[in-house]
């Protein structure tokens, strides 16, 4: 296939345009350019898998570090609750109504925006100059492969956090409704998938960068700003686990379906270098 003929270190490396030399060096340090790295997959899955492996320091290791931090925090909280049992009741009360708070937490730990930026700087900025790479079939097939990778990367810390919250809820006295446990768990995963889809969809629909890796889309900045403001506002909301969890799961499913439809409908027209 065409992509294998041009899949060189230059095309899978950091942009060589007018971005700052310091930024280039920082990114390069986190990229593995070992030509021995390969993949057993085929087609667009091969292309994407090779990208992920070469950028494991930038993508996977970041998610793993966040996961270890979360494990550490959960362990410390469990230890405090064991040593000071009277904190359990208050902690339980907080957990029962603080699920909206974790919308902001999930926004902060999600690597979707960072992954999208890496995709452009270290791959798309070069590949988008090839006509075949802008063909609808190529764009949509590669989008599907990338979405799988982004969701997988972000689900690692999300799974750890979801498990930890269920554990803390249980050891602090639990809940009178057993359904709260799976709702709490799956709502955290739903948030993770939501942000993974959200950042990648924005990248494909509003592709903000030009050939010099400069952001040229005001709409992209506004969309990210509104996302931040919405998540920040969630810090003030107090709603029971069952109510907010169900709303979160349903909203995430609906949003993802609509977003994926928009990508399939419009990305072939919008995914190109900005002038």
Which sequence ranges carry the predicted segments?
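Hydrophobic alpha-helical transmembrane segments of membrane proteins
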Residues: 1-127, 138-275
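Glycine/proline-centered hinge or cleavage motifs at structural transition points of membrane proteins
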Residues: 132-136
């Amino acid at each position: 296939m065409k992509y294998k003929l041009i899949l060189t270190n230059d095309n899978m490396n950091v942009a060589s345009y007018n971005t700052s030399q310091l930024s280039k060096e920082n990114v390069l340090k986190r990229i593995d350019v070992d030509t021995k790295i390969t993949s057993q997959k085929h087609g667009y899955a091969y292309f994407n898998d090779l990208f992920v492996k070469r950028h494991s320091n930038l993508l996977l290791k970041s998610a793993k570090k966040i996961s270890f931090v979360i494990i550490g925090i959960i362990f410390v909280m469990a230890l405090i609750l064991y040593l000071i049992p009277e904190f359990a009741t208050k902690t339980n009360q907080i957990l029962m109504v603080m699920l909206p708070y974790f919308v902001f937490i999930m926004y902060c730990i999600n690597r979707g925006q960072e992954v999208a930026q890496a995709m452009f700087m270290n791959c798309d900025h070069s590949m988008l100059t090839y006509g075949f790479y802008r063909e609808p079939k190529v764009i949509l097939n590669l989008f599907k492969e990338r979405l799988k990778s982004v969701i997988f990367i972000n689900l690692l810390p999300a799974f750890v956090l979801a498990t930890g919250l269920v554990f803390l809820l249980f050891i602090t006295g639990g809940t009178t409704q057993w359904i709260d446990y799976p709702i709490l768990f799956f709502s955290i995963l739903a948030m993770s998938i939501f942000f993974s889809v959200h950042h990648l969809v924005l990248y494909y629909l509003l592709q903000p960068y030009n050939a010099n890796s400069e952001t040229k889309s005001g709409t992209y900045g506004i969309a990210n700003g509104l996302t931040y403001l919405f998540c920040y506002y969630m810090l003030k909301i107090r709603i029971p686990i069952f109510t907010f969890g169900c709303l979160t799961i349903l909203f995430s499913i609906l949003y993802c379906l609509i977003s994926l439809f928009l990508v399939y409908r419009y990305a072939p027209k919008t995914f190109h270098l900005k002038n």
